[in-house]
Amino acid sequence: MTQKHILSGDLLVFHDDPFEVPPEDAVQIQSDAALLIENGKITARDSRDILIAAHPEAAHHPHPNRLICPGFIDAHVHYPQTAMIASWGKRLIDWLNTYTFPEEMRFDHPAYAAEISARYLDLTAAHGTTTMAS
């Protein structure tokens, strides 16, 4: 059975690259808009009223006066270093030897690796990051 949800509010929509064209041509805020989410994937974007009328079986999650944005992309991550965020070192080699290498050696234990990866994913999702590359 398909699970359908409608998430409504003001949508931030990119039509083009804001570094290539004037920002006013690249980005738009659509008021009273909505996203249709089916089985966890966005399948449609339209006005709130149109999507609700077309999908009366969908659960509606209104977010008036809220801006719904695309997820952030982090193109370079070091998830094994999650437990040592903000650790201090005088020089890079000191920092690597004192914090990074010992911490990354702990990932030899699957339970520890699973714990830190879950913490990392929770932190990134809580801050709006939906895509990461290492």
Where are the regions a protein language model picked out?
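Surface-exposed beta-strand edges and their flanking turn/coil or helix-capping segments
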Residues: 20-22, 57-60, 75, 97-99, ...
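Alpha-helical scaffold segments that flank or form the walls of functional sites
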Residues: 86-134
